[in-house]
Amino acid sequence: MNRKLVTVLSVLVIIVFIGYIIIDTAKPLESSKDDAKKSETNEVPDAWKISTEFKAGGDSLKAVTVTLSGKIYVGGNAFVSCYDKGLGLLWTVKTPSAVTGLSNYGDSVFASTRAQILVMNPDGKILNEWGPFEDKSLITSVSANRRFVAFADAENKTVYILDKGGEVKKIIGQNDKHFIIPSPYFELVLDNMNNLYVANTGMHRIETYSIDGVLKSFFGEPGLAPENFCGCCAPAHFAIIPQGFVTAEKGINRIKILNKKGEFVEFVNSKNSFIKSVPLDLASADGVTIYAAYPGDSKLYVFTRK
Protein backbone atom coordinates (compact mmCIF):
# COMPACT_ATOMS: atom_id res chain seq x y z
CA MET A 1 0.00 0.00 0.00
CA ASN A 2 2.83 2.37 0.93
CA ARG A 3 4.59 1.55 -2.36
CA LYS A 4 1.46 2.50 -4.30
CA LEU A 5 1.20 5.77 -2.38
CA VAL A 6 4.85 6.56 -3.03
CA THR A 7 4.39 5.78 -6.71
CA VAL A 8 1.33 8.07 -6.98
CA LEU A 9 3.11 10.91 -5.18
CA SER A 10 6.15 10.50 -7.42
CA VAL A 11 3.98 10.73 -10.54
CA LEU A 12 2.27 13.88 -9.20
CA VAL A 13 5.63 15.50 -8.49
CA ILE A 14 6.79 14.73 -12.04
CA ILE A 15 3.57 16.18 -13.53
CA VAL A 16 3.91 19.38 -11.48
CA PHE A 17 7.56 19.71 -12.49
CA ILE A 18 6.73 19.28 -16.19
CA GLY A 19 3.91 21.83 -15.88
CA TYR A 20 6.29 24.35 -14.32
CA ILE A 21 8.74 23.89 -17.19
CA ILE A 22 5.98 24.44 -19.78
CA ILE A 23 4.71 27.62 -18.08
CA ASP A 24 8.22 28.96 -17.54
CA THR A 25 9.01 28.35 -21.21
CA ALA A 26 5.80 30.02 -22.38
CA LYS A 27 6.47 33.29 -20.54
CA PRO A 28 9.47 34.31 -22.68
CA LEU A 29 7.43 33.41 -25.77
CA GLU A 30 4.60 35.73 -24.69
CA SER A 31 7.13 38.44 -23.90
CA SER A 32 8.76 38.01 -27.29
CA LYS A 33 5.35 38.30 -28.99
CA ASP A 34 4.71 41.61 -27.20
CA ASP A 35 8.18 42.83 -28.14
CA ALA A 36 7.52 41.79 -31.74
CA LYS A 37 4.29 43.80 -31.82
CA LYS A 38 6.06 46.87 -30.43
CA SER A 39 8.85 46.38 -32.95
CA GLU A 40 6.30 46.01 -35.74
CA THR A 41 4.72 49.34 -34.77
CA ASN A 42 8.11 51.06 -34.75
CA GLU A 43 9.12 49.63 -38.13
CA VAL A 44 6.08 50.84 -40.10
CA PRO A 45 7.04 54.22 -41.62
CA ASP A 46 4.72 57.21 -41.78
CA ALA A 47 3.31 57.64 -45.30
CA TRP A 48 2.32 61.28 -44.73
CA LYS A 49 4.10 64.43 -43.64
CA ILE A 50 3.17 67.66 -41.87
CA SER A 51 3.03 70.16 -44.71
CA THR A 52 1.74 73.09 -42.65
CA GLU A 53 1.24 73.97 -39.01
CA PHE A 54 -0.08 77.26 -37.71
CA LYS A 55 -1.75 78.88 -34.72
CA ALA A 56 -5.45 78.79 -35.52
CA GLY A 57 -8.27 80.80 -33.97
CA GLY A 58 -7.91 81.43 -30.24
CA ASP A 59 -6.98 79.48 -27.13
CA SER A 60 -7.49 75.79 -26.41
CA LEU A 61 -8.13 74.62 -29.95
CA LYS A 62 -10.36 71.54 -29.79
CA ALA A 63 -12.16 70.87 -33.07
CA VAL A 64 -11.95 71.11 -36.84
CA THR A 65 -14.22 70.47 -39.82
CA VAL A 66 -13.67 71.12 -43.52
CA THR A 67 -16.12 71.63 -46.40
CA LEU A 68 -16.00 70.13 -49.89
CA SER A 69 -15.19 73.61 -51.23
CA GLY A 70 -12.15 73.86 -48.95
CA LYS A 71 -13.35 76.12 -46.14
CA ILE A 72 -11.87 75.16 -42.77
CA TYR A 73 -13.69 75.77 -39.50
CA VAL A 74 -11.89 75.45 -36.17
CA GLY A 75 -13.22 75.87 -32.64
CA GLY A 76 -11.97 76.08 -29.09
CA ASN A 77 -12.36 78.08 -25.90
CA ALA A 78 -15.44 80.16 -26.74
CA PHE A 79 -14.76 80.76 -30.44
CA VAL A 80 -15.27 79.46 -33.97
CA SER A 81 -12.99 80.66 -36.78
CA CYS A 82 -13.28 80.16 -40.53
CA TYR A 83 -10.35 79.98 -42.98
CA ASP A 84 -10.21 79.69 -46.75
CA LYS A 85 -8.35 76.82 -48.43
CA GLY A 86 -5.17 78.91 -48.42
CA LEU A 87 -5.48 79.26 -44.62
CA GLY A 88 -6.43 82.92 -44.82
CA LEU A 89 -8.69 83.99 -41.96
CA LEU A 90 -12.24 84.86 -43.07
CA TRP A 91 -13.88 85.47 -39.71
CA THR A 92 -13.91 84.64 -36.00
CA VAL A 93 -16.97 84.70 -33.74
CA LYS A 94 -17.33 84.28 -30.00
CA THR A 95 -19.51 81.45 -28.73
CA PRO A 96 -21.42 81.26 -25.43
CA SER A 97 -19.00 78.61 -24.13
CA ALA A 98 -16.10 76.42 -25.25
CA VAL A 99 -16.58 74.49 -28.48
CA THR A 100 -16.02 70.73 -28.20
CA GLY A 101 -16.88 69.55 -31.73
CA LEU A 102 -17.65 70.82 -35.24
CA SER A 103 -19.47 69.59 -38.32
CA ASN A 104 -20.87 71.09 -41.50
CA TYR A 105 -23.41 70.25 -44.15
CA GLY A 106 -24.69 72.47 -46.95
CA ASP A 107 -24.99 76.04 -45.70
CA SER A 108 -24.95 75.12 -42.01
CA VAL A 109 -22.17 74.76 -39.47
CA PHE A 110 -22.87 72.85 -36.27
CA ALA A 111 -20.78 73.50 -33.15
CA SER A 112 -21.17 71.47 -29.97
CA THR A 113 -20.53 72.90 -26.53
CA ARG A 114 -20.70 70.98 -23.27
CA ALA A 115 -24.52 71.18 -23.16
CA GLN A 116 -25.75 72.60 -26.46
CA ILE A 117 -25.59 72.45 -30.25
CA LEU A 118 -25.07 75.81 -31.98
CA VAL A 119 -26.39 76.19 -35.52
CA MET A 120 -24.45 78.76 -37.58
CA ASN A 121 -24.56 80.07 -41.13
CA PRO A 122 -21.40 80.19 -43.33
CA ASP A 123 -20.72 83.76 -42.15
CA GLY A 124 -20.58 82.76 -38.50
CA LYS A 125 -23.97 84.07 -37.41
CA ILE A 126 -25.53 81.88 -34.71
CA LEU A 127 -29.02 81.06 -35.99
CA ASN A 128 -30.15 78.68 -33.27
CA GLU A 129 -29.12 77.05 -30.00
CA TRP A 130 -30.43 73.54 -29.26
CA GLY A 131 -30.46 72.18 -25.73
CA PRO A 132 -29.56 71.57 -22.98
CA PHE A 133 -30.79 68.00 -23.41
CA GLU A 134 -29.78 66.67 -19.96
CA ASP A 135 -29.26 68.18 -16.49
CA LYS A 136 -25.62 67.14 -16.67
CA SER A 137 -23.96 66.50 -20.00
CA LEU A 138 -20.64 66.59 -21.80
CA ILE A 139 -21.20 66.73 -25.53
CA THR A 140 -17.92 65.82 -27.21
CA SER A 141 -18.83 65.35 -30.87
CA VAL A 142 -21.41 66.45 -33.44
CA SER A 143 -22.04 65.32 -37.02
CA ALA A 144 -24.62 66.27 -39.66
CA ASN A 145 -25.95 65.03 -42.98
CA ARG A 146 -28.83 66.13 -45.21
CA ARG A 147 -31.62 65.09 -42.84
CA PHE A 148 -30.16 64.58 -39.39
CA VAL A 149 -27.76 65.89 -36.76
CA ALA A 150 -26.20 63.50 -34.24
CA PHE A 151 -24.16 64.19 -31.13
CA ALA A 152 -22.38 62.13 -28.46
CA ASP A 153 -22.70 62.83 -24.73
CA ALA A 154 -19.72 61.36 -22.85
CA GLU A 155 -21.17 62.17 -19.42
CA ASN A 156 -24.39 60.19 -19.98
CA LYS A 157 -22.85 57.73 -22.47
CA THR A 158 -25.62 58.35 -24.97
CA VAL A 159 -25.97 59.29 -28.63
CA TYR A 160 -28.73 61.66 -29.73
CA ILE A 161 -30.17 61.84 -33.23
CA LEU A 162 -32.03 65.05 -34.08
CA ASP A 163 -33.88 66.27 -37.13
CA LYS A 164 -32.83 69.54 -38.76
CA GLY A 165 -35.27 71.39 -36.52
CA GLY A 166 -33.47 70.20 -33.39
CA GLU A 167 -36.17 67.73 -32.34
CA VAL A 168 -34.93 64.51 -30.73
CA LYS A 169 -35.76 61.50 -32.92
CA LYS A 170 -33.74 58.78 -31.20
CA ILE A 171 -31.48 58.23 -28.18
CA ILE A 172 -29.01 55.33 -28.30
CA GLY A 173 -27.52 53.87 -25.12
CA GLN A 174 -30.02 55.36 -22.70
CA ASN A 175 -31.46 52.08 -21.42
CA ASP A 176 -28.92 49.37 -22.22
CA LYS A 177 -25.79 51.27 -21.09
CA HIS A 178 -24.03 49.87 -24.15
CA PHE A 179 -21.31 52.50 -24.50
CA ILE A 180 -18.24 52.20 -22.27
CA ILE A 181 -16.65 55.67 -22.12
CA PRO A 182 -13.78 55.83 -19.56
CA SER A 183 -12.66 59.37 -20.51
CA PRO A 184 -14.15 62.46 -22.18
CA TYR A 185 -13.55 61.20 -25.73
CA PHE A 186 -16.69 60.02 -27.51
CA GLU A 187 -16.69 60.52 -31.29
CA LEU A 188 -19.31 59.89 -33.96
CA VAL A 189 -19.78 60.47 -37.69
CA LEU A 190 -23.03 60.44 -39.67
CA ASP A 191 -22.66 59.66 -43.39
CA ASN A 192 -24.94 60.52 -46.31
CA MET A 193 -26.49 57.03 -46.29
CA ASN A 194 -27.71 57.54 -42.70
CA ASN A 195 -25.08 55.19 -41.31
CA LEU A 196 -23.99 56.32 -37.88
CA TYR A 197 -20.41 55.44 -36.86
CA VAL A 198 -19.67 55.63 -33.13
CA ALA A 199 -16.38 55.12 -31.26
CA ASN A 200 -17.14 52.82 -28.31
CA THR A 201 -13.81 53.74 -26.79
CA GLY A 202 -13.83 51.41 -23.78
CA MET A 203 -14.34 48.52 -26.20
CA HIS A 204 -11.63 49.86 -28.56
CA ARG A 205 -13.86 49.71 -31.59
CA ILE A 206 -15.90 51.68 -34.11
CA GLU A 207 -19.52 50.58 -34.32
CA THR A 208 -22.00 51.15 -37.15
CA TYR A 209 -25.65 51.88 -36.38
CA SER A 210 -28.74 52.49 -38.45
CA ILE A 211 -30.51 55.81 -37.95
CA ASP A 212 -33.01 53.85 -35.81
CA GLY A 213 -30.25 52.85 -33.41
CA VAL A 214 -29.78 49.24 -34.54
CA LEU A 215 -26.19 47.97 -34.26
CA LYS A 216 -25.17 46.68 -37.70
CA SER A 217 -21.46 45.92 -37.39
CA PHE A 218 -18.23 46.86 -35.63
CA PHE A 219 -14.46 46.49 -35.88
CA GLY A 220 -11.45 47.09 -33.67
CA GLU A 221 -9.43 45.39 -30.93
CA PRO A 222 -7.13 46.67 -28.17
CA GLY A 223 -3.38 46.39 -28.71
CA LEU A 224 -0.18 48.07 -29.82
CA ALA A 225 -0.03 46.60 -33.32
CA PRO A 226 -0.74 49.01 -36.20
CA GLU A 227 -4.19 47.53 -36.86
CA ASN A 228 -5.25 47.77 -33.19
CA PHE A 229 -6.33 50.63 -30.95
CA CYS A 230 -4.03 51.42 -28.02
CA GLY A 231 -4.54 53.08 -24.65
CA CYS A 232 -7.47 52.96 -22.24
CA CYS A 233 -9.98 54.36 -24.68
CA ALA A 234 -9.67 54.57 -28.43
CA PRO A 235 -10.11 55.76 -31.06
CA ALA A 236 -10.33 59.19 -29.43
CA HIS A 237 -11.20 60.86 -32.75
CA PHE A 238 -11.92 59.69 -36.28
CA ALA A 239 -13.23 60.90 -39.62
CA ILE A 240 -14.60 59.18 -42.71
CA ILE A 241 -12.59 59.51 -45.92
CA PRO A 242 -12.97 57.85 -49.35
CA GLN A 243 -10.36 55.23 -48.38
CA GLY A 244 -12.25 54.33 -45.18
CA PHE A 245 -11.36 55.90 -41.84
CA VAL A 246 -8.65 58.13 -40.45
CA THR A 247 -8.31 57.64 -36.69
CA ALA A 248 -6.45 59.26 -33.80
CA GLU A 249 -5.35 57.48 -30.62
CA LYS A 250 -3.87 58.46 -27.29
CA GLY A 251 -1.50 56.52 -25.06
CA ILE A 252 0.52 56.16 -28.21
CA ASN A 253 -0.34 59.37 -30.02
CA ARG A 254 -0.73 58.16 -33.58
CA ILE A 255 -2.91 58.86 -36.60
CA LYS A 256 -3.58 56.10 -39.13
CA ILE A 257 -5.80 55.12 -42.05
CA LEU A 258 -7.98 52.01 -42.01
CA ASN A 259 -9.94 50.68 -44.95
CA LYS A 260 -13.73 50.34 -44.91
CA LYS A 261 -13.43 46.92 -43.25
CA GLY A 262 -11.29 48.39 -40.47
CA GLU A 263 -8.04 46.87 -41.75
CA PHE A 264 -4.80 48.82 -41.37
CA VAL A 265 -3.63 50.69 -44.47
CA GLU A 266 -0.91 53.09 -43.32
CA PHE A 267 0.25 55.51 -40.67
CA VAL A 268 -0.35 59.19 -41.27
CA ASN A 269 1.69 60.20 -38.24
CA SER A 270 3.07 57.89 -35.54
CA LYS A 271 6.50 59.33 -34.82
CA ASN A 272 5.98 62.71 -33.19
CA SER A 273 6.44 64.79 -30.06
CA PHE A 274 2.74 65.24 -29.33
CA ILE A 275 1.73 64.70 -25.70
CA LYS A 276 0.74 61.03 -25.44
CA SER A 277 -2.50 61.74 -23.59
CA VAL A 278 -3.66 64.56 -25.89
CA PRO A 279 -5.08 63.25 -29.20
CA LEU A 280 -5.77 65.35 -32.29
CA ASP A 281 -9.23 66.02 -33.70
CA LEU A 282 -9.44 65.10 -37.39
CA ALA A 283 -11.16 66.29 -40.56
CA SER A 284 -10.80 65.60 -44.27
CA ALA A 285 -13.16 66.20 -47.16
CA ASP A 286 -11.25 64.26 -49.81
CA GLY A 287 -8.76 61.90 -48.14
CA VAL A 288 -5.96 63.82 -49.85
CA THR A 289 -5.44 66.49 -47.19
CA ILE A 290 -5.99 65.73 -43.50
CA TYR A 291 -6.47 68.49 -40.94
CA ALA A 292 -5.72 67.88 -37.26
CA ALA A 293 -6.52 70.23 -34.37
CA TYR A 294 -4.10 69.76 -31.48
CA PRO A 295 -5.17 71.08 -28.05
CA GLY A 296 -1.60 70.72 -26.76
CA ASP A 297 -0.41 73.85 -28.56
CA SER A 298 -3.64 75.14 -30.17
CA LYS A 299 -2.19 74.61 -33.63
CA LEU A 300 -3.78 73.20 -36.76
CA TYR A 301 -1.62 70.57 -38.46
CA VAL A 302 -2.09 69.86 -42.16
CA PHE A 303 -0.98 66.43 -43.41
CA THR A 304 -0.29 65.51 -47.03
CA ARG A 305 1.37 62.49 -48.62
CA LYS A 306 5.15 62.27 -48.71
List each language-model region with its residue ranges.
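Eukaryotic scaffold repeat domains enriched in small/polar residues
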Residues: N2-K306
